[in-house]
């Protein structure tokens, strides 16, 4: 039987909030079977909980943000969510003492490191996968995203940026998802932005934690980071990383194929909602005897071996 997973031990780290620029402490705790992914704002009294759910995503302006009925929010969850998806973590309690998850280095790699330090624990309950039975597509202008049936989890993503630092032959990427492929091929890809946009947002009191330490920063001609890019196609890889985190808001690993062109947080969330609203397009499946078509967290020590 493929079982649900949680953390083996409590893990903690600190970082900077992208939007506030203030120190954030992040703590992840094990949870019981069927608890799901729970975010907590422990800086508030009483503590406010957010359950990972696509209907709770009400702000996708600069990140993916969960907002409750009292307009209390927790922001920038997508990179951590993508790391949870990589290891198939079904149940976890995530605590922050701020309105946002720390941005860390702008990728999912620090969260992967935390999860590896914690270890993964199986729970005595079957893991539920969300399996696509029909193709669902959403579109806005020339941007689109779709999920379709596939025996595994396949992702194909294309971007279309007109910038000297983003070459035409580095704007598409695709791969079959597993913990190992995510760690090796996607987890280190960082978020990116333009120096003029960051300076403008900071003048308005936004993006106060934005810096060269947590993003690829460009001017009109080049990448400004001294160390350059981690991958030649780091931009599209990061957009795919974002999509994995956005889709995992449903709390279940997906069995299907995700394809997208110029999609972002808003369209990713719109697609997930469209799938869930069309109940004939998907089903929950468990694997009692046969192996699941996707590998999650098996032989974690192999994840850094090329």
Curated annotation (Swiss-Prot):
SUPFAM superfamilies: Ribosomal protein S5 domain 2-like
EC numbers for this chain: 3.5.1.108
Cofactor: Zn(2+)
Active-site residues from the entry: 265 (proton donor)
Catalytic activity line of the entry: a UDP-3-O-[(3R)-3-hydroxyacyl]-N-acetyl-alpha-D-glucosamine + H2O = a UDP-3-O-[(3R)-3-hydroxyacyl]-alpha-D-glucosamine + acetate
Main EC class the enzyme belongs to: hydrolase
Top-rank taxon: Bacteria
A biological-process GO annotation: lipid A biosynthetic process
GO cellular component, one term: membrane
Positions with a binding annotation for Zn(2+): 79, 238, 242
Pathway of action: Glycolipid biosynthesis; lipid IV(A) biosynthesis; lipid IV(A) from (3R)-3-hydroxytetradecanoyl-[acyl-carrier-protein] and UDP-N-acetyl-alpha-D-glucosamine: step 2/6
Sample GO molecular function, one term: metal ion binding
Keywords from the UniProt entry: Hydrolase, Lipid A biosynthesis, Lipid biosynthesis, Lipid metabolism, Metal-binding, Zinc
Function noted in UniProt: Catalyzes the hydrolysis of UDP-3-O-myristoyl-N-acetylglucosamine to form UDP-3-O-myristoylglucosamine and acetate, the committed step in lipid A biosynthesis.
Family: Belongs to the LpxC family.
NCBIfam families reported for this sequence: lpxC
Protein name in UniProt: UDP-3-O-acyl-N-acetylglucosamine deacetylase
Taxonomic source organism: Hamiltonella defensa subsp. Acyrthosiphon pisum (strain 5AT)
Gene that this sequence comes from: lpxC
